[in-house]
Amino acid sequence: MSATDPRPARTLFEKVWDAHVVRAETPETPAVLYIDLHLMHEVTSPQAFSMLRERGLKVRRPDRTLATTDHSTPTLPRLPDGRWPFFDAQNEAQVAQIEKNARDFGVELHGLGDPQQGVVHVFGPEMGATQPGMTVVCGDSHTATHGAFGALAFGIGTSEVGHVLATQCLLQRKPRSLAIRVDGALQPGVTAKDLILAIIAQIGVGGGTGHVMEFTGPAVRALTMEGRMTLCNMAIEGGARAGMIAPDDVTFQWLAGKPRVPQGAAFDAAVARWRELPTDAGARYDREVTVDVSRLEPMVTFGTNPAQGIPVTGRIPDPGAEKDPSARATLESALRYMALAPGKPILGQKVDVVFVGSCTNGRLEDLREAARVMRGRKVKTRTLVVAGSHAVKKAAEAEGLDRIFREAGAEWREPGCSMCLAMNGDMLEPGQYCVSTSNRNFEGRQGPGGRTLLASPATAAAAAVSGAVADPRRLVEG
């Protein structure tokens, strides 16, 4: 901002928030916030549409509502008779219900069999629906993914889904702001997934509670859009309401030509507006945290929350070293569930299943990363590779990545959420260990009794070809 500009310096978050306040909050009432984009899937939307029917309401802005199917969809191909091999009747009913709701209320749906169908937080950006400066909501925890574009994006509950459908607005209290400055440069073999796991390990699962995180610094600027989406995707795992990254030329180049993005002179005008979004010099955050990644290694979780992560060369921590009784009890409980011993190296830990996919790491760049490790090798454990969307799957097949996975012995599946949350039949057996590129390692997340170790696609692929936790840097030259 210029020295003569009378406006106060503002953060990226404040600029987007201020532009969408319909009615300011008071001590008694939340702000009324306008929503630019409402993304939907089959699991959290049925009750919301039922509410509309009961009250005789219409969807206020179907043109700002976009739906897909992902959580309940099978990742196996169609049966010879053309039917989809749903895991159970509930999954099939959920998909059928959103198809009916979309027809009845005029909502655009990209469902099973559609070439654009995919995991909601992968397919939305691919469609160009997510753009800088927007407010974006979805009935899904990892809506923060879209903050990578300089949007304010957050998950909402089912009742709020109904509220947005009916009014295109939400009642919201303004969160506080938290800057996560990432200094240094990521070393070869270290990825955005390793970075966000390290950040969460540093601040804890409650470190961002009540805040919107803005990721800044040279290491963030050096990330691709895919890496930025991975970073923002897991902001919620650090307790944040949302995660954001200021848009720049990387953002604009990624968006150019996408279906829903303005074209020609209109795109140039949009970029000019978007360039005004980054945080002003002198703007103040409520909190600031600095992370130095110059010596960061590939990360892997060992416990039952995403903050319980260590370098792949590290050892399982000893609960006895924890001075805080609550933290000690949490760690003891995690190690009991995971059946891991304090002081044991995580390298060499036996793995039963590997999962590459999800809204965290199911994009083309992620699949390339995994293929680079698997190329010319054979997997030693069951490995599922699930593209985040049909567009990603098609692009991966055009590059021959599917052949690399198949020749290695991995299963090349249809797009969907898959083993991220074990809702569609892709799940662990009790006691199995899975190195997963997803975002949550809670007890039973990937199936009752399943044990999840979160990691990057490269680390997951290294585990697949080793049959145990392995350092991907040792398997890839350069």
Curated annotation (Swiss-Prot):
Its EC number is 4.2.1.33. It catalyses: (2R,3S)-3-isopropylmalate = (2S)-2-isopropylmalate. Its cofactor is [4Fe-4S] cluster. One of its GO terms (biological process) is L-leucine biosynthetic process. [4Fe-4S] cluster binds at residues 359, 417, 420. Belongs to the aconitase/IPM isomerase family. LeuC type 1 subfamily. Catalyzes the isomerization between 2-isopropylmalate and 3-isopropylmalate, via the formation of 2-isopropylmaleate. Heterodimer of LeuC and LeuD. This is 3-isopropylmalate dehydratase large subunit. It comes from Anaeromyxobacter sp. (strain Fw109-5).
